[in-house]
């Protein structure tokens, strides 16, 4: 209790910059580890002799299915964990354990369904996404092996949140770190030493997820956990599971739109630019994550500080915390964007040794990320909306870029340009700039009004 009280006192009186660093660094480390998990396969695959470019393109085409699997995991995990936390806060541990058990059962059912559906429909879906005769074999090989490990993927993504919600943030982070380290070690062994190629990359990912899943289950059934995973609690009960799924719908929709966005890009680029354009998009997506994922870590550090002081009506500290978050996000994206614009070939070369793909990606990068500096404005303001309790406007601003701007522009802009592939890539910076301008304007209008009202309330 003393430590908890001290923590609250620090949030309200301690140095804002020091607190920001203290809270952002662990989140940033977690995001970087997640980033490695996401891109390490692609880096190794892109450097497989002779087939690297085609193999990388094939694996990139599987991304929409991977995102859909993630979305279903979020449906149970992102919806169930907060419900369990609320039950714990109410002192109802039994209900919290029933929530966790029910969510686990839902994940098992989803794993069986998704494995069956995606294993058999994989070739057809990948064709629809833009796979060619050259890239389809690599996409199917990677996809089917990954799908066979769907159970462990869902457990990791869906159940790790129940560890975090109990306050075991370090254990939760270790889940990701363990999987990432094993994946990084196994990738070169299976891909190059055992000469398994794309199949080796998929197997490395699945095995690392299996180890992470076992780690989670051992913890949730062990002595240290507060909430225990018990068989009797796994019986589905409507009043228990339905509120969890209802809460998880928002996260499900957000991740699902990423899948739709990925399909829109790959199918359009396959039509207008062929395999090399789709391969470039795979690399660009990974490079874009180098921009966006660290921003999430920075904002995760800033959110509790902004929220606490907003609740405590310490508006000067809210202002200081926001501008600290805003400044770091904008500085990072601007600096990284400048380096990308100067050295596009270097970054493209990290992911593949295919000369033609490197050259095309370097050309596409300067178009696709032309307004990459603006992402810092949009994400920092959107996340600040969330920190100030404005969840609805935050969701609208997040959907603005993807659903209302980017996806339509992918199909509209090629109507006005002779170089259709150029137009598809151009959809990204146009959407980024508009979304950043609108989000920043909306936030500062709200923020200035909030500060004035807050100061008036303090003086009255």
What residue ranges belong to the model's regions?
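Short alpha-helical transmembrane segments in multi-pass integral membrane proteins
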Residues: 1-26, 84-151, 193-248, 306-371, ...
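Transmembrane helical elements of multi-pass membrane transporters/channels
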Residues: 22-41, 145, 179, 208-212, ...
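Hydrophobic/aromatic residues in alpha-helical transmembrane segments
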Residues: 25, 41, 80, 121-122, ...
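Helix-terminus/linker motif at the lipid-water interface of multi-pass membrane proteins
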Residues: 32, 36-56, 126-133, 189-196, ...
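Small-residue-rich hydrophobic transmembrane alpha-helices
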Residues: 56-116, 153-172, 266, 280-344, ...
């Amino acid at each position: 209790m003393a430590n908890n009280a001290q923590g609250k006192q620090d949030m309200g009186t301690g140095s804002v910059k020091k607190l920001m660093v203290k809270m952002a660094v662990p989140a940033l480390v977690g995001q970087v580890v997640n980033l490695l998990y996401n891109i390490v396969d692609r880096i190794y695959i892109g450097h497989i002799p002779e087939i690297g470019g085609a193999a990388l393109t094939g694996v990139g085409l599987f991304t929409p299915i991977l995102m859909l699997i993630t979305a279903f995991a979020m449906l149970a995990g992102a919806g169930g964990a907060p419900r369990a936390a609320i039950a714990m806060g109410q002192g109802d541990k039994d209900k919290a354990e029933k929530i966790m058990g029910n969510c686990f059962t839902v994940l098992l059912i989803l794993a069986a369904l998704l494995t069956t559906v995606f294993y058999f429909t994989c070739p057809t879906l990948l064709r629809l996404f833009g796979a060619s005769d050259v890239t389809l074999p690599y996409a199917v090989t990677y996809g089917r092996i990954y799908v066979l490990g769907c159970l462990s993927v869902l457990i990791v993504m869906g159940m790790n949140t129940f560890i975090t919600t109990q306050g075991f943030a370090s254990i939760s982070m270790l889940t990701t770190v363990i999987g990432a380290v094993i994946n990084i070690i196994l990738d070169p062994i299976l891909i190059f030493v055992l000469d398994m190629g794309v199949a080796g990359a998929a197997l490395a990912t699945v095995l690392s997820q299996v180890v992470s899943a076992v780690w989670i289950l051992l913890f949730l059934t062990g002595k240290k956990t507060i909430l225990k995973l018990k068989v009797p609690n796994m019986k589905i009960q409507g009043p228990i599971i339905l509120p969890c799924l209802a809460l998880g719908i928002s996260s499900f929709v957000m991740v699902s739109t990423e899948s739709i966005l990925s399909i829109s890009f790959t199918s359009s680029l396959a039509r207008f630019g062929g395999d090399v354009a789709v391969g470039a998009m795979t690399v660009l997506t990974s490079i874009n994550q180098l921009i966006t994922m660290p921003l999430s870590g920075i904002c995760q550090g800033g959110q509790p500080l902004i929220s606490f002081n907003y609740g405590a009506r310490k508006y000067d500290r809210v202002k200081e915390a926001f501008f600290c978050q805003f400044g770091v996000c904008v500085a990072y994206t601007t600096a990284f964007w400048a380096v990308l614009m100067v050295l596009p070939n270097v970054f493209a070369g990290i992911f593949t040794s295919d000369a033609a793909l490197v050259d095309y990606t370097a050309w596409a990068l300067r178009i696709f990320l032309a307004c990459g500096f603006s992402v810092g404005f949009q994400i920092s303001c959107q996340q600040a909306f969330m920190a100030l309790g404005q969840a609805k406007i935050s969701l609208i601003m997040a959907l603005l870029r993807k659903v209302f701007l980017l996806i339509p522009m992918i199909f509209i802009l090629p109507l006005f340009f002779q170089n259709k592939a150029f137009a598809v890539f151009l959809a990204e910076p146009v959407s980024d700039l508009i979304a950043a301008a609108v989000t920043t304007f909306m936030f500062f209008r709200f923020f200035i009004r909030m500060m004035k009202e807050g100061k008036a309330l303090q003086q009255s």
